[in-house]
Amino acid sequence: MVGVTSEPRTLAEKVWAAHVVRSAEGEPDLLFIDLHLLHEVTSPQAFDGLRLAGRRVRRPDLTIATEDHNTPTGYADPSFRSRRGDLLTITDPTSRTQIETLRRNCAEFGVRLHPLGDKNQGIVHVIGPQLGLTQPGMTIVCGDSHTATHGAFGALAFGIGTSEVEHVLATQTLPQARPRTMAVNVVGDLAPGVTAKDLVLALIAQVGTGGGRGHVVEYRGEAIRKLSMEGRMTIANMSIEWGAKAGMIAPDETTFDYLRGRPNAPAGTDWEAAVAYWRTLTTDADATFDAEVTLDASRITPFVTWGTNPGQGAPLDASVPHPDELATEPERAAARRALEYMDLAPGTALRDLAVDVVFVGSCTNGRIEDLRAAADVLRGHRVAQGVRMLVVPGSAVVRESAEAEGLDKIFTEAGAEWRFAGCSMCLGMNPDTLLPGQRAASTSNRNFEGRQGRGGRTHLVSPPVAAATAVTGRLASPADL
């Protein structure tokens, strides 16, 4: 491939160089794309563009679609299970149209689709890894800002816009300016009860929502190495929340163990060859990054956001900050607006904040490990009176696994709603939304104004904190139970 060099390189530089098919001075590099993920929201206009130009999908074998953003995750109607794949379950006309359009486009252009009711349906960034489609060293794109999730495997994965979706569909390539690189060096070990979600929220609070802008970030250090693949995906998933183009973690035995035997992973001698190559995907000892950040994992405690962006967060033991204490006027102004929207007063203890809704799910924390963590806390307890708790698996496979382990019974016996797979309350594009003024503890990735429903107030938390909060009715950690 164009761009191969013997100079010391970072992980990101190695993957980038292996995919450059054309490079010219003063122009973006043209990258080959190994995997293109689609969903119903950002793909319709891209397919329309192909149709107007008389083009086909260049590599349907490298393209996969699912239905996730607009899909309902369940109703009180007991027949919902049997009607799961029926479009009649989608009551919103816009959502229904988007689902119908995706199905029609995939059928016309020969794209693999996992629709509602399919055994592999789920959130796009959950099903890619669980099917073994996501692999180290790949380039992966999707018309979705949390595509960086796949970087947990040592893939270069990033979100793209609709016009870029069309370009990849038509050519299986994408012109991209070469990004800068950054290392996040996580020193020390996480304390018991502190999760990957706490780590990444603490990182974003430290560097700010623009701290990674223009960079491909590599997360490094012993604390990262000790994380499961689910934990690593949580970290990589939120790379965009501090401005990074992508986030990557070098593959290792944990990665290989996760992928081994999955449906689309290499097998036999191909597996051995793949692992041999994947082992080369590490940053060279003498390679340099354009920027570096250090985070001390040993000092992190359960973390929660108080404002309206993921960088406005603090340890659960802290209080809502006073805007005047912040360093710059833009920060102070943003904090004032956030406190007004969130209906919070400076100095209020975060543990004193009562919630109306608790949401466990999303492409950040909707995997089996996340559900186990929430169930472990919830076991033997009841959801507080007046609190609604939704537990939404990230995929049909996760749901099936959870039910095989009896997690669904723990949730329902505690008074939580056990629902079907989808993006759900992560965003206000389906029936699972907050009402105006409702306050939620959510394991999702964004706490923007109106993100979970017009006028809804979101506090980002880990699955254990979410479960403890559901029991107490106020922001809490498992240690409080």
From Swiss-Prot:
Positions bound to [4Fe-4S] cluster: C363, C423, C426
Q: Which reaction does it catalyse?
A: (2R,3S)-3-isopropylmalate = (2S)-2-isopropylmalate
Name the needed cofactors. [4Fe-4S] cluster
Q: What Gene3D superfamilies does UniProt report for this protein, alphabetically?
A: Aconitase, domain 3
Q: Which pathway?
A: Amino-acid biosynthesis; L-leucine biosynthesis; L-leucine from 3-methyl-2-oxobutanoate: step 2/4
One GO BP annotation here?
Answer: L-leucine biosynthetic process
Source domain of life is Bacteria
Q: Which GO terms describe its molecular function?
A: 3-isopropylmalate dehydratase activity; 4 iron, 4 sulfur cluster binding; metal ion binding
> Which Pfam families does UniProt cross-reference here?
Aconitase
- What does the UniProt keyword field contain? 4Fe-4S, Amino-acid biosynthesis, Branched-chain amino acid biosynthesis, Iron, Iron-sulfur, Leucine biosynthesis, Lyase, Metal-binding
The protein's enzyme class:
lyase
UniProt cofactor note:
Binds 1 [4Fe-4S] cluster per subunit.
Q: Which InterPro entries does the UniProt record give?
A: 3-IsopropMal_deHydase_lsu (IPR004430), Acnase/IPM_dHydase_lsu_aba_1/3 (IPR015931), Acoase/IPM_deHydtase_lsu_aba (IPR001030), Aconitase_4Fe-4S_BS (IPR018136), Aconitase_4Fe-4S_dom (IPR036008), IPM_dehydratase_rel_enz (IPR050067), IPMI_cat (IPR033941)
Subunit structure, per the record?
Heterodimer of LeuC and LeuD.
Q: What does this protein do?
A: Catalyzes the isomerization between 2-isopropylmalate and 3-isopropylmalate, via the formation of 2-isopropylmaleate.
Report the sequence similarity comment from the record: Belongs to the aconitase/IPM isomerase family. LeuC type 1 subfamily.
Report what the protein is called. 3-isopropylmalate dehydratase large subunit
